[in-house]
Amino acid sequence: MKRALLSVSDKTGLVSFAKGLIDRGFELVSTGGTHRELAAAGIAVTSVEEVTGFPEMLDGRVKTLHPKIHAGILARRDDPDHMEALANHDIQPVDLVCVNLYPFAATIKRPDVTRAEAIEQIDIGGPSALRAAAKNSDSVWAVVDPADYEAVLTGLDQDDAHLRQKLAAKVFAITAAYDAQIVHYLDPEPFPEHFTPTYTKRQDLRYGENSHQQAAFYVEPDPNPTSLAAAKQLHGKELSYNNIKDADAALAMLREFSEPAVVAVKHMNPCGIGLGKTIEGAWDKAYAADPMSIFGGIIALNRPVDLATAEKMHKLFLEIIIAPAFDDDAYAVLAKKKNVRLLTINTADTPAELGTETTAIYGGLLIQTRDNQTETPADMTVVTTVKPTDEQLKALAFAQTVVKHVKSNAIVVAQADQTLGIGAGQMNRIGSVELALTQAQQNDNFAGAVMASDAFFPMDDCVDYAAKHDIKAIIQPGGSIRDKDSIEKANQYGIAMVTTGVRHFRH
């Protein structure tokens, strides 16, 4: 008779799976709560203690860690010496191991969890049995996921060796991810000696950045509730690779603001950001910032979408709209377009994201802390004769907040509640200045605008160009060996200039 070892934390589908195994000639061996669950369902089951002749001990820390279990799993069926050793020690082979792991990740999510409670949820016997079965998958089934039970029963009928190998790989992937979560809990150092990230595939994507590239979307085990990975899609086509990148960029910008805000993004750069007393007012500002570029854009709002705002957005082609919620009548209007993707997520009043970000390079990985630095008027040093007004200080702070989300070289022209022009990704700074001001001067709200730069001005040409296009105040990090030239140029034109000492490159 074949033997199956069952020891699961997640009892989903357990009884029906056990019955399926019995129907296929298996004897069931089980532990603790799993044994009780099966016995209560009237299923014949043998306890591990009866097999090993040794009781569970140390409050359940030692159950299956015994030669009569592990030798039965690991013995190679095609090796006469292995099989003779089993016979000599009266050990029966184990042909299937069904184990899922202690809920460590769920335990450490609890805000009140103690270290002792977390440690007790580190599974030892489960991963050991699973890995043993996976190592010997030429003969032994390793089952770690209740979602696979039906496929396993079918595979047993067909002696599906390919499925056994696939499930073995899944075991090693899951136990590796499980161990990685333990590592991160015990040592939350952002730059550890060994970096072991763990992600689970959410979905295969139609293609990557371009149609000839393949792609998939992976998520963390417990994504932050304000992250795109935690979003709920209510309507529209499946998200694409570019959609996901753009939406993530939009949310990163949106987190900067507590007042009603709307962010419009194209190709991971903002094309319009507006603030208002209402979300409709914020939309009006974001739209007016660049009515051309917003077409086909990704829109993120930090307040529920009402009918008035929805009716305005409905007039445009938009790829994605992300908000905390949609009023029923607003949703009805927006959902008339079958392709627009409507997502809900916790965006209201969320703080700037923390933690680290990674960038893959060929042969390696870069890790850095996120650029969470935000400058306020208190962080600004006036370096010119003319001092900025209070309204200009507000506008400078807003422009400075936006510029760190723009690809370098980055220039933002703005009022206190609206971007007017954005110059992104130019290889020289004056090129970005020209782009931003060309766009900004088309806006009816341009008078009195200010300008932000993500890095210092290497020469005074940027200030000269800004002055000739009626910029009234400038914010920049400073730090160039030619700072004096830019400051003198600002004084010459009567422009207020402040420095922050903080650069915001974005590559």
Swiss-Prot record:
Q: Name one Pfam family in it.
A: MGS
Q: Which Gene3D superfamilies match?
A: 3.40.140.20, Methylglyoxal synthase-like domain
Its pathway, per UniProt, is: Purine metabolism; IMP biosynthesis via de novo pathway; 5-formamido-1-(5-phospho-D-ribosyl)imidazole-4-carboxamide from 5-amino-1-(5-phospho-D-ribosyl)imidazole-4-carboxamide (10-formyl THF route): step 1/1; Purine metabolism; IMP biosynthesis via de novo pathway; IMP from 5-formamido-1-(5-phospho-D-ribosyl)imidazole-4-carboxamide: step 1/1
Q: List, for all copies, the residue spans of the domain called MGS-like.
A: 1-144
Q: What is its EC number?
A: 2.1.2.3, 3.5.4.10
- Cellular compartments per GO CC: cytosol
- Extract the InterPro entries matched here: AICAR_Tfase_dup_dom_sf, Cytidine_deaminase-like, MGS-like_dom, MGS-like_dom_sf, PurH-like
| Membrane-spanning ranges | none
Q: Report the superkingdom from the record.
A: Bacteria
Q: Which reaction does it catalyse?
A: (6R)-10-formyltetrahydrofolate + 5-amino-1-(5-phospho-beta-D-ribosyl)imidazole-4-carboxamide = 5-formamido-1-(5-phospho-D-ribosyl)imidazole-4-carboxamide + (6S)-5,6,7,8-tetrahydrofolate; IMP + H2O = 5-formamido-1-(5-phospho-D-ribosyl)imidazole-4-carboxamide
Could you list this entry's UniProt keywords, alphabetically sorted: Hydrolase, Multifunctional enzyme, Purine biosynthesis, Transferase
What PANTHER family does the record tag this protein with? BIFUNCTIONAL PURINE BIOSYNTHESIS PROTEIN ATIC, BIFUNCTIONAL PURINE BIOSYNTHESIS PROTEIN PURH
HAMAP family attached here? PurH (MF_00139)
Question: What's the domain remark here?
Answer: The IMP cyclohydrolase activity resides in the N-terminal region.
- Name used for this protein in its record: Bifunctional purine biosynthesis protein PurH
**Gene that produces this protein:** purH
